[in-house]
Amino acid sequence: MKVFISYGAAADQVTALRLQALGAVNGLTVYVPPAHTRQGLGVLLDSESSQKLSEAEVVLGVVGTGLAEACRQELNTAMGLGKNMIIMSYPAFAYQLQQYFANLVVVDPANPGEAETGIVGYLKAIDAQQNAKKALLALGTLALGLLLFASVDRD
């Protein structure tokens, strides 16, 4: 299964790369756009990211420290392509994302169980193959753990 991980800002790349490694050891082909795509206000997606996004069966959005224009474009493109998506965000960025993504899961470090419930609820609602649901659940759970660990590291 091919997964595209769109991350909010350059600082979120660490979480995305950890998810990529965890996905790879579980048999997933995971693409994470390079950090240079999060610098500046690029107008278009780079060609490699665009191709990988088109090939992906699942798109996971990780917005922990900010929302770069490249991430916004990737997520909008994924929506336009009808990709199975799940977007995870800290509460600070939820207001920016809620109006665009019905499948937003807000990760509150004080109440991680609520985010897990949101992920499971979303996965039950989408009409996707069983493998895609399992992959999304696994990646969502891993992302939740990594985001929580990242918040502990900052404290």
Residue locations for each model-derived region?
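C-terminal interaction surface of TIR/SEFIR-family domains
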Residues: 13, 92-155
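Conserved beta-strand-loop-alpha-helix hinge of the TIR/SEFIR fold
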Residues: 50-94
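Structural signal for conserved beta-strand scaffold positions within catalytic alpha/beta enzyme cores
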Residues: 32, 87, 106-108
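Long, low-complexity, intrinsically disordered polar/charged segments
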Residues: 1-13, 49-68, 113-127, 131
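Short, glycine/charged-enriched secondary-structure capping and boundary segments
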Residues: 18-21, 73-77, 100-103
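Short, structured coil segments at secondary-structure junctions
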Residues: 26, 81, 99-103
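Conserved N-terminal substructure of TIR/SEFIR domains
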Residues: 1-58, 141-155
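Short secondary-structure transition/capping segments
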Residues: 2-9, 75-87, 133-143
